[in-house]
């Protein structure tokens, strides 16, 4: 995924045009970012994913290879590379629209077989930027391999019991946590009351 980020003092209202202060194109996707950082920290990282046959896809593969992320299991199905349109205001608050293209072309059975075939595997990390079926199969394989499983539930949607029961670490941000708990804000929230059940 590629991040297309515009910085502005004020987020435009519907029908309004405002001037931006800066525009940045960068590598994105929570899974890809975690893979890159892990590789830079010395971990042996394999990325299983899908990018387009466009210039964004070329750049992502080059970036993986440059930092030591193994990209041999990245497929290129002919779709456009997925993008995230990000707007950041003067307070650093962001608003993100994810347009999934190639990401959604991953085959869940292939993902399962790949995870089962990788030697010396210790962790499986994924998020909601791929399909629910891929997450199910990835975590199923991960637990069969006695791996730690980590789920980043963004963009947020309810989490089926089949996924939640195979998740060791759930790492939502503030907004996603509020959605899970059906609350509007963390102000005065008692975290001892947090409940994580299927279909949150």
Task: Describe each region flagged by the PLM.
Residues 1, 63-79, 86-200:
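Ribokinase/PfkB-type carbohydrate-kinase core domain
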Residues 34, 81-84:
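Residue-level marker for the onset of beta-strands and adjacent loop->beta junctions
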